[in-house]
């Protein structure tokens, strides 16, 4: 499923390719590219739920909190997001690339992935996908892109 999301993001979304394709055509294209239908349907469902969150139809579970409060992760979240991933999310919050809402969207979308293995590189792509699709986060997306693609040394690589 994550491979399908990456392919879609790199091939269509990130490259600003016109994406006015119906789901059946897209599914056929992805099948021809070598992806399994179950993974395709899971990825499309994941993207639909991301769109629902952005449109306010569904909200991740979070409450308004003190901006200085520390996020406590559930046991399942800690299993999926190792210390390096959690540290990177905190780093992005401190750099004001992420805010409470976008952080929670990212965590919710990470937890919705059907994968057993998840690392920092995967998290970076999920962050890009979420920020790309959230209205008003264009600057945060651009900052994240710069962190990922233009920095050769240091913590973020």
Swiss-Prot record:
<dbReference type="InterPro" id="IPR007456">
    <property type="entry name" value="Smg"/>
</dbReference>
<dbReference type="Pfam" id="PF04361">
    <property type="entry name" value="DUF494"/>
</dbReference>
<protein>
    <recommendedName>
        <fullName>Protein Smg</fullName>
    </recommendedName>
</protein>
<comment type="similarity">
    <text>Belongs to the Smg family.</text>
</comment>
